[in-house]
């Protein structure tokens, strides 16, 4: 599987993120979960708009334009020969010192993963499944 990582397509085994990336250390970043149906990325423009809004909310400067993110997302799917998939587009604050200061992270990181989606087994569609609801607010 090919992964988009900071401007390059690399094999998933070679896709490395630093342990000093603030996305890993502090959850400092934004992401979108997107679907690919019959070779078409579902509502990509709306997803990218929401990604920009989320980044702005945490004062994270996206390192790519909306068109560049769109092209990279579509190319990730193409490189993997996918027509139906789940796409995860992630932008992290990037590598920095320990500590919460975002200005110590000079370069945001971008990675995009697209993979064949594994949905529920057929028996769940035929028979349903048990669920639980909880009052936790997100």
What do these predicted regions represent?
Residues 1-138:
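Conserved alpha/beta cores of soluble small-molecule-handling proteins
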């Amino acid at each position: 599987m090919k992964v988009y990582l900071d401007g390059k397509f690399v094999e998933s085994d070679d896709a490395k993120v630093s342990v000093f990336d603030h996305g890993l250390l502090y959850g400092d970043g934004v992401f979108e979960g997107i679907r690919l149906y019959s070779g078409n990325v579902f509502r990509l423009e709306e997803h990218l708009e929401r990604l920009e809004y989320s980044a702005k909310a945490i004062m994270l400067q996206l390192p790519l334009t909306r068109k560049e993110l769109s092209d990279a997302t579509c190319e990730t799917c193409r490189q993997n020969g996918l027509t139906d998939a789940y796409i995860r587009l992630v932008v992290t604050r990037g590598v920095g010192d320990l500590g919460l200061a975002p200005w110590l992270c000079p370069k945001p990181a971008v990675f995009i993963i697209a993979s064949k989606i594994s949905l529920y087994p057929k028996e769940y569609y035929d028979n349903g499944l048990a669920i639980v609801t909880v009052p936790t607010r997100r």
